[in-house]
Amino acid sequence: MSRSISIGGIPVGDGCPVFIIAEIGINHNGDLSLAKKLIDIAVGAGCNAVKFQKRTPEACVPAEERNKIRETPWGRINYLEYRKRLEFNEQDYGEISDYCQKQNIIWFASSWDVESVSFLD
C-alpha cells in the first residue's frame, strides 16, 4: 500500500520526489522586501515551499523577559517590542501569498500559540 498525501497539488510520500521546504522563519526581520528575496532564493534553489513562523509576542514572551533591553536591527529596544517588529500582519501575509503564487511556490507558516492558529486559519 502506497502512502502519500498532496501538498499544494504536489504528491508527497512513498515513491514521490523529495518535497523541499525552505525555512524562512523570522529571518526576514519583519521586512517584506527581505522576505521576498528569501522566497526568490528558495525558488532558485528548487524548493517546493517556504515556511514562515507566526507568533503572538504577548503570548510567547515570558513576562520577566519583556522589558529587558536587547541589541536589535532597530537599535536597543525591549524584547517584547523586538518580537512585535518581527511579526507580519494580515496584509503582509496577503502580499506574501500573492508573491508566492506568482513565483509558483507553496507557502505556509507554523503557529506558536493559539491566537496565531486563529490568525492563520
PLM regions and their residue ranges:
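N-terminal amphipathic alpha-helix/helix-capping segment at the start of soluble metabolic enzymes
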Residues: 1-21
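Active-site-adjacent beta->alpha loops and helix N-cap segments on the catalytic face
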Residues: 3, 31-32, 60-65, 89-93, ...
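Hydrophobic faces of well-ordered beta-strands that scaffold small-molecule active sites
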Residues: 20-24, 50-52, 107-110
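Conserved, mostly hydrophobic/aromatic
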Residues: 23, 42, 120
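Active-site beta-loop-alpha junctions enriched in small/polar residues
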Residues: 25-27, 53-57, 112-114
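Glycine-rich anion/phosphate-binding loops
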Residues: 27-45, 90-91
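Glycine-rich, proline-tolerant flexible connector loops at the mouths of alpha/beta enzymes
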Residues: 48-87
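Active-site beta->alpha loop and helix N-cap motifs at the rims of alpha/beta catalytic domains
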Residues: 73-121
